[in-house]
């Protein structure tokens, strides 16, 4: 059996670029002009607490990178270690490109992965990505690296190979196939079957898990990292208590899918809803169409034209409507 380490290059590049710089802030008082450096905003706020308001200061983020060769070395070391941990004979590296189809989904409130442009990116991220490209990384346009990792896992199962998705992204927990999260796992893990979900041990009002139930949970709960939350389409709230209330005792795919459908029906009791999307456009969708939209957010494409069909799935498992 051929074993391949399928690497999420986006994560490797980001982590190594971030590790190769020191971050701090400079706070300047708007009236006096006096400036002071702090390691982070928490330290700054602690010093001015009870003395000044944060609004009295201009705060600037400062990023100080080390020599780029250290970041390159970090990426080489990481990828070599991934290959060895997976006991792979070769490795593949994928990087995100342009035109992710999910960016165009008419989600309410906020665009898919919205607000990420406001995040501070490592100074050397572009150079690290370019280095991986020159090392043979493949650019994925039209969808995400997560989709490509899911595709390679599916192709491995189809062809009798062991393609191991090397990523720390939680979305992979809902994809059938081999996965290796080098920050949490001592060795690759096979994700298969219905699986299970449980409260996230570090993040409040979030969950963790694996298998198809993890996907079903994302389908109805959403993903705070990717900025989609199905209950927002109806202006409702839905947390982990509600999530476990509908999925905890489900033992089969049919029970899970029925529970997900029933929750969407509670949000959209008339069967149709009209809402305003993040870009200001107005849309009218049926329950199934809304479920299709959110499934598109959570479902990783196993091939380029792999489209999730809610209607067909509901009919296949015999969901009562």
Regions found by a protein language model. Give the residues of each.
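Extreme N-terminus of proteins, especially the signal/transit-peptide cleavage junction
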Residues: 1-2, 288
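Noncatalytic, basic helical substrate-engagement surface that gates or grips nucleic-acid strands
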Residues: 2-162, 166, 177-186, 190-192
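Short amphipathic alpha-helical patches
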Residues: 33, 320-321
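Extended two-metal-dependent nuclease catalytic cores across DNA- and RNA-processing enzymes
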Residues: 88, 111-320
């Amino acid at each position: 059996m051929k074993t391949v380490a399928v690497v999420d290059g986006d994560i490797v590049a980001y982590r190594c670029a971030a590790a190769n710089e020191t971050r701090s802030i400079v706070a300047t008082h708007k009236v006096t002009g006096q400036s002071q450096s702090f390691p982070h905003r928490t330290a700054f706020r602690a010093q001015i607490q009870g003395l000044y308001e944060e609004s009295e200061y201009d705060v600037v983020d400062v990023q100080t990178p080390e020599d780029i060769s250290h970041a390159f070395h970090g990426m080489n070391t990481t990828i070599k270690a991934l290959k060895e941990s997976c006991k792979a004979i070769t490795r593949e590296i994928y990087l995100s490109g342009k035109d992710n189809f999910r960016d165009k989904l008419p989600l309410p409130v906020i665009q898919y992965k919205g607000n990420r442009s406001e995040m501070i990116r490592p100074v050397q991220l572009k150079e690290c990505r370019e280095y991986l490209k020159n090392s043979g990384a493949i650019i994925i346009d039209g969808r995400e690296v997560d989709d490509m990792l899911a595709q390679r896992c599916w192709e491995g199962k189809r062809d009798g190979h062991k393609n191991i998705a090397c990523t720390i992204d939680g979305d992979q927990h809902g994809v059938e196939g081999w996965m290796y999260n080098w920050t949490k796992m001592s060795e690759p893990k096979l994700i298969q079957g219905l699986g299970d979900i449980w409260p996230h041990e570090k993040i409040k009002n979030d969950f963790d898990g694996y298998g198809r139930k993890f996907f079903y949970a994302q389908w109805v709960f959403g993903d705070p990292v990717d900025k989609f939350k199905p209950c927002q389409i109806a202006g409702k709230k839905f947390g982990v208590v509600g999530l476990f209330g509908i999925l905890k005792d489900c033992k089969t795919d049919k029970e899970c899918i029925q529970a997900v459908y029933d929750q969407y029906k509670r949000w959209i009791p008339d069967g149709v809803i009209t809402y305003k999307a993040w870009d200001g456009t107005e849309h009218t969708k049926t329950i199934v169409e809304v479920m299709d939209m959110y499934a598109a957010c959570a479902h990783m494409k196993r091939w380029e034209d792999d489209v999730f069909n809610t209607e067909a799935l509901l009919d296949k498992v015999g969901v009562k409507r």
